């Protein structure tokens, strides 16, 4: 399962760990992903999405029906 938010598209990015001596070693910054069940009133069922914390805020703001319509338009399965 890839580490990508289904709502926002956030994915891991790369950067450096910097020690006190400023040595640089590569690292990954991972998105804050959670599998979360959302109740879709129009379909009378639960939908499980892998979303970041920001994705949950987007769903709270726009509504689950609007977000699912955007996912369908992109051709994503949920």
UniProtKB/Swiss-Prot annotation:
Give the Pfam families listed for this entry: Ribosomal_L28
Q: Name one GO biological process term.
A: ribosomal large subunit assembly
InterPro entries (alphabetical): Ribosomal_bL28, Ribosomal_bL28/bL31-like_sf, Ribosomal_bL28_bact-type, Ribosomal_bL28_sf
Q: Which residues form a coiled coil?
A: none
Q: Which GO terms describe its cellular component?
A: cytoplasm; cytosol; cytosolic large ribosomal subunit
| Segments crossing the lipid bilayer | none
| Keywords recorded for this protein, A-Z | Ribonucleoprotein, Ribosomal protein, RNA-binding, rRNA-binding
Name the Gene Ontology molecular function terms of this record.
rRNA binding; structural constituent of ribosome
Taxonomically, the superkingdom here is Bacteria
**Gene3D superfamilies listed in its UniProt record:** Ribosomal protein L28/L24 (2.30.170.40)
Read off the NCBIfam families from this record. L28
Q: How would you summarize the oligomeric state and partners of this protein?
A: Part of the 50S ribosomal subunit.
This chain belongs to which protein, by name?
Answer: Large ribosomal subunit protein bL28
């Amino acid at each position: 399962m890839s580490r990508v938010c289904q709502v926002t598209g956030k994915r891991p990015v790369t950067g450096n760990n910097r020690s006190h001596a400023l040595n640089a070693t590569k690292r990954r910054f991972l998105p804050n992903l959670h599998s979360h069940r959302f109740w879709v009133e129009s379909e009378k069922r639960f939908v499980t999405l892998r979303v970041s914390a920001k994705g949950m805020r987007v769903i709270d703001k726009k509504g689950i029906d609007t977000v699912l319509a955007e996912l369908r338009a992109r051709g994503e399965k949920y």
